[in-house]
């Protein structure tokens, strides 16, 4: 799991048994896969188009879910644990770290 640069933009991928799968929502201009847990949930950030700000994503069971913190210009996930708790950061005039899990969000200011 990681990302590669093709000379223009970054693209997330998952490598499993010497087979590579691109991890990127349909239509996205770029993606960065940053973390994976034991259930193979992948987290990271992507840009819906070249002019858009970054949005956080989760990828599990072949389904992408996008996350944007309200009022943020940028959101990304950096890691995920086996319980599905995610760490990341978001920009709301300044950079704020956060911990998010099922039913909670803890902002670090």
Feature names for model-found ranges:
Residues 1-109:
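Residue-level hotspots at or immediately adjacent to binding/recognition sites across diverse folds
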């Amino acid at each position: 799991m990681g990302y590669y640069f093709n000379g223009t933009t970054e693209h997330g991928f998952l490598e499993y048994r010497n087979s590579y799968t691109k991890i990127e929502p349909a239509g996205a201009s770029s993606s960065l896969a940053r973390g994976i847990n034991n259930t193979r949930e992948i987290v990271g950030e992507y840009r819906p188009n070249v002019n858009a700000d970054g949005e956080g994503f989760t990828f599990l069971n072949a389904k992408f879910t996008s996350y944007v913190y309200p009022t943020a210009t940028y959101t990304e996930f950096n890691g995920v644990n086996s319980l599905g708790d995610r760490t990341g950061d978001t920009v709301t005039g300044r950079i704020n770290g956060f911990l998010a899990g099922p039913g909670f969000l803890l902002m670090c200011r």
